[in-house]
């Protein structure tokens, strides 16, 4: 039986192979062609991946085996060079970050923040902004009444050196300085980052987190465990006024709300305070942030692409949400200009008077958005404003208000205006959003902006009028004036301690105070505003905006923003005045006559891609990668005095500007 079956199977196979049917043949060939097409697509992808991998490995091989020309090699780091020269770690070092650069992580949150426990909401990839923007805004905002945590939310500062080494991936803040300190012998036992929640008022960092007490204990511990060597403190930006607050707090008795260290605590524990980019007297950009959630970059973007950030676009109300969040941060109020018209100028005069605009057309490329704006110059109608600039007018409403003599300006008293009437803007038509602007009558808004200009003194009245709740809360923690009599008991209150014009440096004649900052970059000094108009169905909750269509004959007026010399964020007058004059020698602000030193770093853009953001940059954050500044900090930490590193080094007109400022010393 089985031989018969094998014979039949063999016969059928032979028939099919010898006499194949045409129809069957056709059906067999078509799938083969389709399979061939699919395989060729996969093969192409595989070949492409192979080419890329081969090229990558070839480049790696060349990188490791072929000598790199000297001109393409990264320069030797200051830490390596100083270590070779015998410079070694000596004084313990405390780093104090400023606003924004410190990381914040979530410890408790709403259901929308599920999965984010102990993950960074600030100071990382910022991917959560795109994934859940409203949830992100809610968790970074503080309570509008207390300035502390909202109920059910706990966001805290990231501890340790990682708190502010990088602001975002590949964007260093303190990392380069930390690495260079390590090269001369620093490590965890003698190097510390004093992180704190930079959103809070300085007093509230102690109330909620005991940040000041922790800093005091850390300084005492590092002093005791490092051979009783005094500590070198290196604050940056707002960290400078935060540490100024600490200097007063630590010696104030415990019953008066201080740290109880006693009058000699600073003299015993601190060798020097090396302030980097200090915002001692505030920054004008804090005004524009609180007034309209804007700065020069946003104004430029609006002039290039009108409507991009307006409420009409996708109904996002981006700036409205950012303004509501920033209005809950008391720390921003600490950065408002201090000293009033005596420091920043009045309607007709200012400290920079008589100084020509130092930036030529050619140098305007330093402002990236400004350069972009120039490329579209012929496409945009631009109004021209003639110099001389009136920098004392921190905010001017309209071109005429920025030019007219003060006698021709409106004499409006903001304090006499009513905020609310029957036509108040109590709702918007683009989703639920509320700000303090919603309580203002349209009549009041128009009067505020009608042919008026505001100085550093009157702009505070303007902010009190448009955001009374925010200013009442924040001004319980900060003051922005000049003390008449520093011995007046009222200056024992903590709200004066972060203002160098309303507090004294400690009695520590051997201490040194440094002001290190960049110069040669256009820095925001004053603004020209206009009333915002809404052409679409959405009605903006922010009635004012910088007039981005206004340009001057030089780069000192660009996009409605006037620029002066500085480090791109802090004008020279704010960073340098106290070391140049306010604390120079024995003054009422520096009763023990501790030495002060000015060290300026002239900005030089990066010369190659290998320099990243520049080894000679003077920009506000990038300066912490400046080789000259790093060398100065390392030498001070290793025991050098201000005279031994070269004393003052000045490129700007800070001394001349300081001479023009007349205050009681």
UniProtKB/Swiss-Prot annotation:
Give the enzyme's EC designation: 2.3.1.158
Active-site positions, per UniProt? 237 (acyl-ester intermediate), 567 (charge relay system), 620 (charge relay system)
Q: What general EC class does the enzyme of this chain belong to?
A: transferase
From the Swiss-Prot or TrEMBL record, state where the protein is found: Membrane
* Bilayer topology annotation: Single-pass membrane protein
Alphabetical UniProt keywords: Acyltransferase, Glycerol metabolism, Lipid biosynthesis, Lipid metabolism, Membrane, Transferase, Transmembrane, Transmembrane helix
Entry protein name: Putative phospholipid:diacylglycerol acyltransferase 2
Give the organism, scientific name: Arabidopsis thaliana
